Amino acid sequence: MSALRSYAAVSLLAAAVLPLGGSAEAGPVRNDRPLGAYDQQVVERVRARAAARLDDPACSRVLTDFKDRGGRTLESNLQPLGVSPSRYLLELSFVDGTRLPVCRNETVMMAVTPGVPRVFVCPQGVGRLNSRLSRVEFRSGSLAEAMVIHEMLHTLGLGENPPSTLEITERVRERCR
């Protein structure tokens, strides 16, 4: 197995879905810390490329592949907002996840509470600059894009386990080539 493939397999374990009522649940914006300038640039680059992928109908069908706990497709959860999947992703809030306990787990890249339109980006670690997402983008831009789309699906109500993190990311990668 190549080093990149091994890294990709490990990185697929990189998202955390916080339980409803968890520390990332919707709350006052004042608790959210903005990303540093470099990480904000990383998010903007990755998000723009991921949004371009979502403009392809084959990719945006991933919103019909999964359902929320109530049995609704993620596409049906997006429809009341009156925006395309790519526009939704471009408007989604990405914030600093440094204070989240789940980000202490070095395999977690980002964290979301299902149905809450906010993504927490985990740092590389204590005393290290930049986010884990920046490391993934450096090694595999397409994997970083799939991970951002994966997190977007959670913000539209997708839970996890089932489906597993690996199943979600692999489906995104299949649909959004």
Task: Label the model's feature ranges.
Residues V148:
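Substrate/cofactor-recognition hotspot
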Residues V10-P19:
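Bacterial N-terminal signal peptides
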